């Protein structure tokens, strides 16, 4: 049985999210393996080779997914491997997290208001400021931002099922974020942002906006900023982002912004 087919069946069987299914699809596309190839030795050799061309964090994710598929294959009797030692470790040092400060986000919004051109159904000078404010407030991923609908907004709450995890999630909205989306036209299936722009168009427009504003980063920085300022104000970023485990939030918190309330040591006298 081909590994790609087994991975697809595994996702369906365990009810995996679309995001997880896509990660497995990309990985198994790289590996023209069969299920019988999921031995410790072969996985070790792949990881060692992959480290020569891929980031350690990426290879570490590959290790995790291959180990999951290996365990599933062993349970179902599709794999025989008498090796009892664990798969080799991959030391992944996560890079320093960078988010946008409030001043940088305000500058980005000001720049967005000067944009010319349109999405398919809305001026960029209207769409982009609304998106930035709502994405910062909610901390949602791009896929969720493009999927949310008007009927999911109930007062100052937005209820949705996160596409990556399949978990129900509630976002607490501010007057500012509600006022931002009130400027947008309503169309089609009722998606707040997704009916106004495609994913590819959004990425291209946002990349151009960031360049014009002369800022580092991408739309992912809004999620990081949301997590960082949530934590800074006493809101647990784990629940705010919809993570299942608390350990994940460290990949989103900008420790420089978190240090805003810290004082320096007394100067030498």
Named regions from a protein language model:
Residues 1, 99, 162-166, 241-266:
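Catalytic-site neighborhood detector that most strongly recognizes the C-terminal catalytic loop/helix
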Residues 4-53, 65, 69-74:
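Basic/aromatic-enriched alpha-helical hairpins
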Residues 36, 81, 121-126, 158-161, ...:
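Major-groove DNA-contacting interfaces characterized by cationic-aromatic clusters
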Residues 36, 79-81, 92-113, 165-175, ...:
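DNA breakage-rejoining catalytic core of tyrosine-based enzymes
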Residues 60, 79, 88-142, 146:
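Basic, Lys/Arg- and aromatic-enriched nucleic-acid-binding interface segment
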Residues 114-124, 171, 183-191, 203-239, ...:
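Short, basic (Lys/Arg/His-rich) helix/loop patches that form interaction surfaces
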Residues 138, 143-183:
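Conserved tyrosine-mediated DNA breakage-rejoining catalytic core shared by Y-recombinases
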């Amino acid at each position: 049985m081909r590994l790609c087919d087994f991975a697809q069946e595994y996702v369906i069987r365990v009810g995996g999210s679309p995001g997880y299914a896509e990660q497995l699809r990309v990985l198994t596309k790289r590996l023209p393996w069969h299920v019988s190839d999921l031995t410790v030795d072969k996985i070790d050799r792949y990881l060692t080779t992959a480290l020569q061309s891929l980031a350690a964090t990426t290879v570490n994710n590959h290790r995790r997914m291959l180990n999951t598929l290996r365990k599933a294959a062993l349970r179902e009797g599709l794999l025989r491997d008498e090796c009892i030692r664990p798969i080799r470790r991959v030391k992944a040092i996560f890079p320093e997290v960078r988010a946008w400060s409030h001043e940088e986000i305000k500058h980005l919004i000001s720049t967005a208001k000067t944009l010319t051109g349109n999405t398919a159904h809305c001026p960029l000078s209207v769409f982009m400021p609304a998106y930035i404010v709502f994405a910062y407030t909610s901390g949602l991923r791009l896929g969720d931002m493009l999927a949310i609908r008007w009927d999911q907004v109930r007062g100052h709450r937005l209820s949705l099922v996160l596409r990556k995890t399949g978990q129900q999630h509630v976002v607490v909205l501010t007057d500012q974020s509600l006022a931002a989306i009130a400027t947008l036209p309503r169309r089609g299936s009722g998606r707040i942002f997704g009916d106004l722009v495609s994913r590819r168009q959004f990425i291209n427009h946002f990349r151009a906006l960031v360049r014009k504003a002369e800022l580092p980063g991408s739309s992912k920085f809004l999620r990081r900023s949301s997590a960082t300022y949530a934590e800074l104000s006493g809101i647990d970023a784990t629940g705010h982002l919809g993570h299942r485990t608390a350990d994940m939030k460290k990949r989103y918190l900008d420790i420089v912004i978190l240090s805003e309330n810290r004082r320096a040591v007394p100067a030498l006298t």
